[in-house]
From Swiss-Prot:
Keyword Cytoplasm: no
Gene that this sequence comes from: atpF
Protein name, entry field: ATP synthase subunit b
GO molecular function: proton-transporting ATP synthase activity, rotational mechanism; proton-transporting ATPase activity, rotational mechanism
Species annotation: Elusimicrobium minutum (strain Pei191)
Membrane topology: Single-pass membrane protein
Location of this chain's protein in the cell: Cell membrane
Amino acid sequence: MNALLTPDYGLIFWTIVNFLLLVFLLGKFAWKPIIGALEARENKISQDKKDAQEARDEAQKIKAELDVRLSNISKEAQEKLAQVEALAKQQKDAMIKDAQASSERMIATAKEEIEAQKNQALKEVKKEIADMAVEAAAKIAGVKTDPKTDAALVDNIVKDIINKA
């Protein structure tokens, strides 16, 4: 027990020499590679942080561009929708105008046809009246007339009737 508590100066000397030799050798051969590896790792971490920040900045820039594009697309869509609505309204108005014009033409055509049929009916009635008047006059007179005379007489009677109407 005494031997453990008593220092051996030779052992202390060689322990110190070994320690200093170990420190020297580690400093000469191992310390630089360890420090180099630590610095390389620190540089890599620093570079990764820079790259991550650049990527984050780029992502924010792209997001901002996409937001602008989305806004522009939304505006364009609204403009297109407004144009389509305006075009649809124009087409609707044009169709209504065409339908009105068509109905007015149909009404005018129908009125013209009615007027033509009325005039034709009046002519036929007047001709029949004139024929009946000629026949009645011929019966009263008891005279047989030729067709030329009948036609001239009918024309005169028709003219008289037309002038009176």
